[in-house]
A protein has these predicted regions:
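Core beta-strand-centered patch of the WYL/Sm-like small regulatory domain
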Residues: 94-173
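Surface-exposed, Lys/Arg-rich phosphate-binding patches that contact polyanionic backbones
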Residues: 10-30, 64-86, 90
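Short, positively charged interaction helices/loops
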Residues: 22, 42-75, 97-128
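Short, ordered beta-strand-loop transition motifs
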Residues: 1, 52, 145-147
Length: 173
């Protein structure tokens, strides 16, 4: 069963979430659940927890997977003294304090892992990109200042090099 969640954090965190939601064209509930899934079992930071700023709250439902794993996340965090709301607040603050390219890796972990493996093995892969399936040879990840420091993929298609935004890749095989 899906759990209803309410989290309050500094306005700065909400601004970062809003920017990423718009950049990646994700629904609010989707991005919130991806963040919890990506950081729930990681070491979270208390950096920024004491920010004195206008507070904002979000309400959303945990997806089925996060609903099942949430109590384990809380236990494994080693922060048992924290309430669920404080634990979630720290997850979102940790996310907001990360570089945009790292935030992107959290949201699209599986795609990054598959492409990284293909780069290491110098192997061609298929990507679903802009409504087309393309056979590519990934070369490297790069930061693109034009897109706000999010990640771009340098790749070859038919021996011609291209640089594409990672957010445009929907699927990797």
């Amino acid at each position: 069963m899906r759990r209803k969640i309410r989290v309050t954090f500094p306005k700065l965190v909400q601004e970062v979430l809003q920017i990423d939601q718009e950049y990646f064209n994700l629904k609010k509930e989707t991005i919130y659940n991806l963040i919890i899934e990506g950081l729930g079992f990681q070491e979270i930071s208390s950096i920024g927890a004491d920010i004195i700023d206008e507070k904002r709250s979000i309400n959303f439902n945990l997806n089925e997977k996060n609903s099942k794993l949430f109590s384990e996340m809380l236990k494994k965090s080693g922060l048992n003294e924290l309430s669920e709301a404080e634990f979630l607040k720290r997850i979102f603050i940790t996310y907001a304090n990360l570089h945009p390219s790292i935030r992107e890796r959290i949201l699209y972990k599986d795609i990054f892992l598959r492409i990284e493996e293909a780069i290491r093995k110098k192997k061609e892969i298929n990507i679903y990109y802009k409504d087309k399936l393309e056979k590519i040879k990934p070369i490297s990840f790069e930061r693109n200042k034009e897109n706000g420091d999010y990640t771009a993929l340098r790749m070859k298609i038919y021996n011609k090099e291209y640089l594409i935004e990672m957010k445009e890749i929907e699927y990797v095989t």
